[in-house]
Amino acid sequence: MSPTQWDFPVELCCRPMAFVTLTGLDVVYNAVHRAVWDAFCANRRADRVPISFKVLPGDHEYPKCRPKRTSYEWYIPKGILKTGWMNKHLNLVPALVVVFYELDWDEPQWKEKQSECATRVEIVRQSLQGRNTKVAVVLIQKKTPLPPGEDVIASERAAALCNACELSGKSLFVLPHTDHLVGYIIRLENAFYEHAQTYYYTEIRRVKSHKEFLNKTTHQLLFVRHQFKIAFFSELKQDTQNALKNYRTAYNLVHELRAHETNILEIKTMAGFINYKICRLCFQHNTPLDAIAQFRKHIDLCKKKIGSAELAFEHAAWMSKQFQAFGDLFDEAIKLGLTAIQTQNPGFYYQQAAYYAQERKQLAKALCNHEASVTYPNPDPLETQAGVLDFYGQRSWRQGVLSFDLSDPEKEKVGILAIQLKERSVVHSEVIITLLSNAVAQFKKYKCPRMKSHLMVQMGEEYYYAKDYTKALKLLDYVMCDYRSEGWWTLLTSILTTALKCSYLMAQLKDYITYSLELLGRASTLKDDQKSRIEKNLINVLMNESPDPEPDCDILAVKTAQKLWVDRISLAGSNVFTIGVQDFVPFVQCKAKFHAPSFHVDVPVQFDVYLKADCPHPIRFSKLCISFNNQEYNQFCVIEEASKASDVLENLTQGKMCLVPGKTRKFLFKFVAKTEDVGKKIEITSVDLVLGSEAGRCVVLNWQGGGGDAASAQEALQASRSFKRRPRLPDSEVHWDGIVIQASTMIISRVPNISVHLRHDPPALTNEMYCLVVTVQSHEKSPIRDVKLTAGLKPGQDANLTQKTHVTLHGTELCDESYPALLTDIPIGDLQPGEQLEKAVYVRCGTVGSRMFLVYVSYLINTAIEGKETVCKCHKDETVTIETVFPFDVAVKFVSTKFEHLERVYADIPFLLMTDLLSASPWALTIVSSELQLAPSMTPVDQLESQVDRVVLQTGESASECFCLRCPSVGNVEGGVATGHYVISWKRTSATDGVPVISTVITLPHVIVENIPLHVNADLPSFGRVRESLPVRYHLQNKTDLVQDVEISVEPSDAFMFSGLKQIRLRILPGTEQEMLYNFYPLMAGYQQLPSLNINLLRFPNFTNQLLRRFIPTSIFVKPQGRLVDDASIAAA
């Protein structure tokens, strides 16, 4: 049997569609016919009716219809389903034949055309004689027909044509060849589909009618056949629900058949076909659980029906195909929108199909192991006269034989031999790899990494069996990483063993060495004798000799490999193989550890490299070298031991590079760091351990960083979580798990032996030249030189502080914006042992708040390291936080000449500006001077002189000044009028004369200025006396450009009598002044209220007496009347 026997037929797997043939179309030479055909078949959308079209000539011979049986009494079927039946009804026997004919209703030669059309229809009927196939006629017309009933001629001629062709009116169609051709074609399709539905319905009834004549004794096969045919016709009719129902019935009937070795293959074949149909329809109906349940039932029923033991591999092949087909159906359903999950996806079915394909391979290897002298039978028992079997699932040498007894055992034996010999030619590995590849793709899609890796291992092994070692190695190498990272050491060992065989058979030196190194290591679960063999082979390779063959390899492949190894040895090339071990687990472990996280530059840097071998025998290495990020140190960290390649496993009790299995070996390295690396990190970039010698071959094991391989991280985690007590070891040995890799260290400067002291008087005052005295004293035993000072604001603080902080060495002059915030590398000379010096640094802080200041002193000193003279740079820094505060608080207020608080002032009316300085400094302050800098809008009433010169203020004390000002009329200014600045010059009382005076500028507040229409000024003595005349003059000044009508009245007071106009009305011209004179006569002593002056402005009713009383006094102090004395007593007084 051919290896493609197990593939399902195409007609079974496709979607059944109604078959309609089109005749009368010349699609080659007639453009109209070609356009009609293209409209039927080109670019069919999913929403169009499911019909399969085919163009055939009018006289095409269709398959002959067999005569119908009237009785099945003596009929014995020869099989279940003929191999050509499905194809016949899909592609050969149409449900409808459509005759296309070009004929218009107004055709002049109508009779002749009608007769020709009837003849064509009759020819088609003759070729379909005995079948129920429907016939229809389509008239291709050039004109668009009129609506039904309007064209009388068309109606008459259509009836006549139907009569001539013996057609019903429903089987005659008109197809106008217009711009809307596709629309007409779609309507035609729908009509054809209805005719096809009728045909398949008739066929179903015809098949059902046969069942009445069947009996269960001799016609069991026919029950299955008829049920399958009904289901298949239902599918063609697109009645999928009834199709599924009938397929299920047919499936049950198949398993009711009496099974025997002679018909078991036919039963399984038909069961597989029907199961495929059931599962396909379940997926189509979006009931995947039903499909899965049906498939499981199918497998449970069939997995024990093996058949002939000599052909057991056929059953495995059949089972593999069942799983593969279901996987294909499942995957197709997913592409159409079905949702799968991790635990239920097509990958599991492809995996099971691959499993049965592997079983098939093993069975074939066991059953088809004939000697070379056995030849293929002649004549070929697998050949048939027609080239194909008559019935599905039957043997070619006994087709149609239903007897359970083998009439010709010899013929049966020859047939089985032919099948076995054919099976030997099947490339099973290709089948298995294809199925595994499909499964891997599915598990990758559904994020099942372990299943994917497991199947990739099987693929690699299958490639190995297929002798495609390159692909096998590629796959196995890909999955090793997963098994290493998760610690599946047994699985990893198995994979490595296969990979080692592949690399040996291809004579791949580097791969062979790499896998050997890992199989010798702690991750390998091989026994010691196997490891010893691999170790011996590895040493042979390093000695430029061929290794011994790996066990269980194909004999022919081994012979080819031995030739390749001979060629490898003879070829001249690079004999050094560098292998990075961070991605696998070699037989040597490495850990590097610096003694400390940092080293002073005047102390040698020391670190240990720990090595531990896990191979079965002691082994000697030739070289150990360490690489750093600064390659200048590499030369100091090399251990080398000259030895021959043959000494790798000899003289192992001697030599410093010998590693004993299970024992930790420590190598100490030290070197002197360069002064240029102070402040830098020294890092071990790699550790190289060389096995072998350059005379033969040598392997360089390269650890990145300070060591560690693919298993180190997991082992360290397990060790940290373990509560197991570690056994005690001798003092010279250490526990490997207790060693922690430390691959980097910092080089820091030499410890300084100087003292740095800071002297200052905090807090600092804003804008003052704050003095910070730095005292540096040397405690070194030798002179230090090139002493430099860096002082100022510590970097990394707020940028605003940097802009407002300035540092200088000269305290006699003020800093400006050009001075930096940090003075760097100020040379201060050399210092002898015990000598000290002072340096004053002045800082000006422009804003309040905390600042961190840095004082950094560096110097050079000669020192001896490991007997070598070296210049070391040392430094010491001190930081201090200084708070900056305002030296004093300044309060400013505006008052009237009566010392009443003013919210606003009035144009040209004098007012008072009062300042109050409150000392906020903890130190005494000296106010050197003060100055009032008026804005142009303000004028002084009298001379502006400082009233606080040379005043010393202690903490909490205050000093006040008062200035009389006048503001001319400036109109309506929004936001008020600027007053000016108040400048205070001050310094600390304790400061020396050379310290500059600090000027603090206070911006005075703006004031609102209002214009008043009338200004009243009173001119009166400072006090009065009882019963003595008190002259008072009121000056009324018109401040407007209008003539003012003024009403004046004086209200008497109980404390005074007065003479003058008690009530008067007068006019005051613009800009002029009017004087009113009154004589007040005090009657009582004490602080008395004056007679009240009331003014009413007719033009300005808002001018109130309350406003008036801001300008004139309302009371005066009256002294009591004194005794009469002479002039001498007055003079004496």
Swiss-Prot record:
Pfam families reported in the protein's UniProt record: Foie-gras_1, Gryzun-like
GO cellular component: Golgi apparatus
Subunit text: Component of the multisubunit TRAPP (transport protein particle) complex, which includes at least TRAPPC2, TRAPPC2L, TRAPPC3, TRAPPC3L, TRAPPC4, TRAPPC5, TRAPPC8, TRAPPC9, TRAPPC10, TRAPPC11 and TRAPPC12.
Modified positions (N6-acetyllysine) in chain numbering: K245
Protein name: Trafficking protein particle complex subunit 11
Organism: Bos taurus
Keywords: Acetylation, ER-Golgi transport, Golgi apparatus, Transport
Function per UniProt: Involved in endoplasmic reticulum to Golgi apparatus trafficking at a very early stage.
Family per record: Belongs to the TRAPPC11 family.
Location of this chain's protein in the cell: Golgi apparatus; Golgi apparatus, cis-Golgi network
Major location category of this protein: Golgi
GO terms of biological process kind: vesicle-mediated transport
